[in-house]
Amino acid sequence: RKMPFNQKPQKFNAKINAVTIGSGDKTVTIGGDCTFPFYSFDAESENCPKIGVEISDMGLEGVSEGIKAYYEGATTMADIAKKAAAMEGADFVALILEGGDPNGVNKSIDELIAVVKEVADAVDCPLVVEGCKNVEKDAELLPKVAEALQGRNALILSEKEENYKAIGAAAGLAYNQIVGAESAVDINLAKQLNVVTTQLGVDAKKIVMNIGSAAAGYGYEYVVSTMDRIKGAALGQNDNMLQMPIITPVSAETWNVKEATASEKDMPEWGPQDERGIDMEVETAAADLAAGSDAVILRHPESVKTIS
């Protein structure tokens, strides 16, 4: 005798916050769902995941041959930004200011702000701006970025526990941007940063989390379990300090692992280098979205097209 299967949708009386990035008629909204990722059998998804294209203030230095080919003919940051915005499947442009790193090129804040303005003037799509990853420099740099982008409703990535007062207050209060809150793959650290940011006076619905990332195969299980726990607490326990949507910068992780960086001369049996980089980027982004990311940031046009 066959037993009938009656599916009962899992309904939560809670939602992930819907956060809109961008201004005018060029906006994207991330979050807003009341179900686990891709559980469309429980409820319709309010906003499908979004994809950003990463570009750097360093131009095309150090990028793969396939990426260079896509940007052929682009000589200025404005040119690069326009091509990124036009990429098939792109929802927004993410500018990373890696040249500001004091342990690297150490560009001045004025130089970096000039790049931010050039990119902002070149494209009208939603903008995400990432700092240089140095907490002291970002504490000075990102408030100036927030000031330069007034009126754009941009996402500023990211404040951390060490510099949230400077960045959170500037981006979230003084200049009315969206605050990216970055923690290191730990639900308690993610929640604590959201709590202290809202205590500054920043609206919880103007915060997007970057809970940390890794390339697939590189301690990646921690990323999955952390996202899983965050979504579980946000929806199952209606924890409003974990209901911020999640954005994950994927490309910075995946293009730096040996599978993507080893040359074909060194590793002929691994196949074409560009394809390996795309594979790492696609599989990591797909896993991030399945685990709970509401947006991912990618670099290669093939990756963007595939994930979209």
Which residues make up each language-model segment?
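Active-site mouth loops of central-metabolism enzymes
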Residues: 50-83, 104-107, 131-135, 157-159, ...
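Acidic (Asp/Glu)-rich catalytic clusters
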Residues: 84-88, 114-122, 143-150, 167-175, ...
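N-terminal amphipathic alpha-helix/helix-capping segment at the start of soluble metabolic enzymes
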Residues: 1-71
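Catalytic alpha/beta core domains of metabolic enzymes, predominantly
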Residues: 162-307
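Short loop/turn segments at strand-loop or loop-helix junctions that form parts
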Residues: 53-58, 93-100, 212, 249-252
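Glycine-rich, proline-tolerant flexible connector loops at the mouths of alpha/beta enzymes
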Residues: 62-69, 89-118, 123, 129-136, ...
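Catalytic beta/alpha-barrel core
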Residues: 94-96, 105, 126-137, 151-164, ...
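Short, well-ordered coil/turn segments that N-cap beta-strands
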Residues: 47-51, 89-91, 123-127, 150-154, ...
